[in-house]
Amino acid sequence: MDGLPGRALGAACLLLLAAGWLGPEAWGSPTPPPSPAAPPPPPPPGALGGSQDTCTSCGGFRRPEELGRLDGDFLEAVKRHILNRLQMRGRPNITHAVPKAAMVTALRKLHAGKVREDGRVEIPHLDGHASPGADGQERVSEIISFAETDGLASSRVRLYFFISNEGNQNLFVVQASLWLYLKLLPYVLEKGSRRKVRVKVYFQEPGHGDRWDVVEKRVDLKRSGWHTLPLTEAIQALFERGERRLNLDVQCDGCQELAVVPVFVDPGEESHRPFVVVQARLVDSRHRIRKRGLECDGRTNLCCRQQFFIDFRLIGWSDWIIAPTGYYGNYCEGSCPAYLAGVPGSASSFHTAVVNQYRMRGLNPGTVNSCCIPTKLSTMSMLYFDDEYNIVKRDVPNMIVEECGCA
């Protein structure tokens, strides 16, 4: 399949398939179905890799004069698919960005990521391809939340964090930590000795405004640096009550005497702003049926997988999706002879959903023949900002078409 006409005609089928992924809400307001009375003109030679039956069998064929509009429709369908998989109603409204220095520090600490010369973040395994080993039953999310402050005068420093619980899912917190930077000021010490302080973090019990629990850690300091304190129980309790705001009071015993300064929310120290890291998992009990499929190589007319890459910069999403830089919105195309029909598993249920959509739109389902559709979908890792400016690292299931079949 070469050139824009081929890609756009293939996109006609994918538009229908994407709507099937998203469910009824993806269709928007009802529009009249295409008339099945007159057969469409044949596509340009080679436009679909050899078979005009591909899209007519799926009910998604469009005439050449409609192809320009269809590309835009296709991209909108892909956007809705991504937001649906992230359980978001719309893209976040990024009115003010998290300070770049703070974000870069957190990413380097947690992911060994790097910032390229063009300012884009590059992180191993977040390249838009399927995540290695991510198709198992266990789905893991990683959430990074940066500290804010109420500015209250107190002997303690009060910080708070808005921590997303990923669409109110039943998440189990595997590990959660507060990262705090301790800065050493000039101070005369005996040779070989270290500054020893005790950091205490008081966290407010959800639902009990007057009750505080504490975690503490003894720290021996030789130089300025980052230190972590465990908050697993505090954040698990927060999630269980359906709350998002985590209030912390931080004390440092011995810091003043030994010229140790914990860095909190300081405009002059953005790269050392405290942050909380939450690793949580959601167990998915569903099993996938694995099937082998064909790759579209220009030599086959049968149902196959066509690779298609979407750069997030080109659709205006690079301001809230940190990594990957784009999405492999692969799709299925090709003919489905009778001997290839009836692929079991996810294909059958998918085809049922598509036919039901056509029933609601008034199209006779008897005219819908066997269709080339995804039979295996894989997970993709994403790093993005949510509505609360948390950085979320999430393995998102059913994002990338890996194999295609007929049903």
UniProtKB/Swiss-Prot annotation:
Glycans are attached at N93. It comes from the Eukaryota. GO terms for molecular function: cytokine activity; growth factor activity; hormone activity; protein homodimerization activity. The gene is INHBB. The keyword Signal applies. Residues 27-60 are annotated as: Disordered. GO terms for cellular component: extracellular space; perinuclear region of cytoplasm. It is found in: Secreted. Residues 1-28 form the signal peptide. This is Inhibin beta B chain. SUPFAM superfamilies: Cystine-knot cytokines. It holds the Pfam family TGFb_propeptide. Disulfide bonds join C296-C304, C303-C372, C332-C404, C336-C406. The keyword Translocase does not apply. Keywords: Cleavage on pair of basic residues, Disulfide bond, Glycoprotein, Growth factor, Hormone, Secreted, Signal. GO terms for biological process: activin receptor signaling pathway; cellular response to insulin stimulus; cellular response to starvation; fat cell differentiation; negative regulation of follicle-stimulating hormone secretion; negative regulation of hepatocyte growth factor production; negative regulation of insulin secretion; positive regulation of follicle-stimulating hormone secretion. Its main location: secreted. Belongs to the TGF-beta family. Residues 29-292 form a propeptide. Inhibins and activins inhibit and activate, respectively, the secretion of follitropin by the pituitary gland. Inhibins/activins are involved in regulating a number of diverse functions such as hypothalamic and pituitary hormone secretion, gonadal hormone secretion, germ cell development and maturation, erythroid differentiation, insulin secretion, nerve cell survival, embryonic axial development or bone growth, depending on their subunit composition. Inhibins appear to oppose the functions of activins. Activin B is a dimer of alpha and beta-B that plays a role in several essential biological processes including embryonic development, stem cell maintenance and differentiation, haematopoiesis, cell proliferation and wound healing. Signals through type I receptor ACVR1C, abundantly expressed in pancreatic beta cells, and type II receptors like ACVR2A. Upon ligand binding, these receptors phosphorylate intracellular signaling mediators SMAD2 and SMAD3, which form a complex with SMAD4, translocate to the nucleus, and regulate gene expression. Residues 30-46 have a biased composition (Pro residues). Dimeric, linked by one or more disulfide bonds. Inhibin B is a dimer of alpha and beta-B. Activin B is a homodimer of beta-B. Activin AB is a dimer of beta-A and beta-B. Interacts with FST and FSTL3.
